[in-house]
Amino acid sequence: MKTESLTISLEEMMEAGVHFGHQTRKWNPKMAPYIFTKRRGIYILHIFKTARLLAEACEFSANAASQGKQFLIVGTKYQAADLVSAAAKKARCHYVNQKWLGGMLTNWSTIETRVTRLKQLEDQENAGVLNQLPKKEAAVLKRQLIQLRKYLEGIKYMTRLPDIVIIIDQQKEATAVEECIKLGIPTICLVDTDCDPDLTDMPIPANDDARSSIRWILDKLTTAIREGRNRVT
C-alpha cells in the first residue's frame, strides 16, 4: 500500500536545499554514485536518486509502523535537536537529541535503570515530595532530575530496544551507528557527501546540516510512520 508521504516534490527538495553537499575537499569516495556534479566548490547530490531512496525509506517505515515496530530518532547536533524532538513526538517515536550516551543500546539494561530513576524522581516531584525534603537533599535530587531529563526524556517510555533507528548525521552519531550495527538494528540514515553509505541499511543522500533539509526529510519519514500506525495489521 502506497503512503501519502511518498508524494515527493523535487521542487520542494530544491527549496529545502536537500541537494547541497559538503565542500569538495571534504568527501567520501563511496558517495560518488549519489553525486551529480560540483558547483563553486560544493558537491551537488543527485536529487532523483535521493527522491527514490527517500521514497523507499518512507514505504519501509510505513510498513514497519503498521506492524507495530518501534522507532528511535537520533540527532544531537544543535541545528537538528528541536526538529528531532518535535518530529518524534508527532509520530510517537522515541528520540535522543542532546547527547548519545555510550551503551545507550548495547548496554540497555543500565540505561533502563536510569530511565526508571527518572520516572521515580518525576513521580516524587509531581507528588510534592521533593519540596518536603531538607534543602540540600532536595537540591541534589532536583539536579539529578534535570540531568536525567536532559538526556533521557526522549526514551522515557522506551521499554525495549527499538526496531528501527533513524539517524540524522552519520558522522556526529558514529557511536549510535556502531551500536546499531553491533546489535543488528536496521538504520535509516541521512548521508551527506562526507559519509559512508555502506554503514547504514537505508541511506538517504541529503544535506544533513541545513535545518530546512533536516525538517523536510523528517517530515516525510514521520508522516509515513503516522500513516503506517493508522493501518496497524
UniProtKB/Swiss-Prot annotation:
One of its GO terms (cellular component) is chloroplast. The gene is rps2. It holds the Pfam family Ribosomal_S2. GO terms for biological process: translation. The keyword Ribosomal protein applies. One of its GO terms (molecular function) is structural constituent of ribosome. Its main location: plastid. Keywords: Chloroplast, Plastid, Ribonucleoprotein, Ribosomal protein. SUPFAM superfamilies: Ribosomal protein S2. Signal peptide: none annotated. It comes from the Eukaryota. Belongs to the universal ribosomal protein uS2 family. It is found in: Plastid, Chloroplast. This is Small ribosomal subunit protein uS2c. It comes from Staurastrum punctulatum.
